[in-house]
A protein has these predicted regions:
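Generic preference for hydrophobic
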Residues: 92, 106, 130, 237-239
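Membrane-anchoring hydrophobic helices of lipid-metabolizing enzymes
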Residues: 1-104
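Short acidic-hydrophobic, aromatic-tinged amphipathic segments that line or gate anion-handling sites
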Residues: 92-93, 152-155, 245
Length: 281
């Protein structure tokens, strides 16, 4: 379903157009109302898309982003409100347990490139930033908006560069700039099953001393095929647990990774879990 404000505003403009065209006094002109409604709705969507494209030219990705852009956050949330309901129906559980005060590290399995959109839709008030592979910065529009939302880019082939990204995440949390979302598997695997974790990512929570929000996603891997068929995908997002700092105090990152892996694996079921090693340092 499209956002209410978009539907209502289109209805108001269509009613005004119908009134000016005399549709309410002449029944033969009632066709003006639905045509005006659809036309105005499309014009708003096209105009908004054009604005997003034009504004992206003002974004300099070479300039360090020291804080979250409220304006870009607002635009991103509007895009998510507009696009996500058109392509997926989200069935979410546990959203009431998301921390309301303070920052957190959110971890989840990773199935498709649009996984972040699910969390933006489910937790619009949580001010999320996403750890992403550096190649995504080159994506049309998305790369520039990621920069404004302080999304740390990680080089998965260079351990030293990856460490810098981890330290950046820790600083974002400590400075209370945003909550961080990371996918511990590091990759989207072809079989779409849960694979081993890169346990170093849990250093982010340990060093920043923040809760770890454990989530799972299901069915986002079908989005691409269903979009082509103009079919909505039923996506399942489950918040399994919120692990407080005192609960993981004294644990190594491997132990913590194994605990979270087990939690996700049990929820997803054996058919969605790889049989390989659980976590790697």
């Amino acid at each position: 379903m499209l956002p209410i404000y978009l539907l209502v505003s289109s209805g108001i403009f269509a009613a005004v157009t119908g009134l000016l065209a005399g549709s309410f006094s002449d029944l033969s002109r009632l066709w003006v109302l639905p045509v005006s409604y659809i036309g105005i709705l499309l014009l708003q969507i096209i105009g908004f898309s054009l604005f997003l494209w034009l504004w992206s030219f003002t974004i300099d990705t070479e300039k360090p982003q020291e804080k979250d852009s409220k304006f870009c956050r607002f635009l991103t949330n509007r895009v998510v409100e507009l696009v996500v309901p058109l392509i997926m129906k989200i069935h979410a559980t546990g959203t009431e347990n998301i921390p309301k005060d303070g920052r957190f590290l959110l971890v989840s399995n990773h199935l498709f490139d649009l996984d972040p959109a699910v969390f933006l839709r489910c937790f619009p008030k949580s001010q999320l930033t996403f750890v992403s592979k550096r190649e995504n910065q080159k994506m049309f529009l998305i790369g520039k908006y990621m920069h404004k939302l302080m999304c740390p880019l990680i080089n998965r082939e260079n351990d030293r560069e990856a460490l810098k990204s981890i330290l950046r995440c820790i600083q974002i949390l400590k400075d209370d700039l945003a909550s961080v979302v990371i996918f511990p598997e590091g990759y989207i695997h072809k079989d779409r099953k849960l694979h081993h974790f890169r346990s170093g990512v849990f250093k982010i929570a340990q060093r920043a001393n923040v809760p770890i929000v454990v989530c799972t996603l299901q069915n986002t891997q079908y989005l691409k095929a269903n979009i082509r068929r103009l079919k909505r995908t039923h996506v399942y997002m489950d918040l399994l647990d919120v692990i407080q700092p005192e609960q993981y105090q004294g644990m190594t990152t491997v132990e913590l990774g194994n605990q979270i892996y087990e939690m996700m694996a049990q929820h997803l079921g054996p058919e969605n879990v790889s049989t390989e090693e659980r976590t790697i340092p």
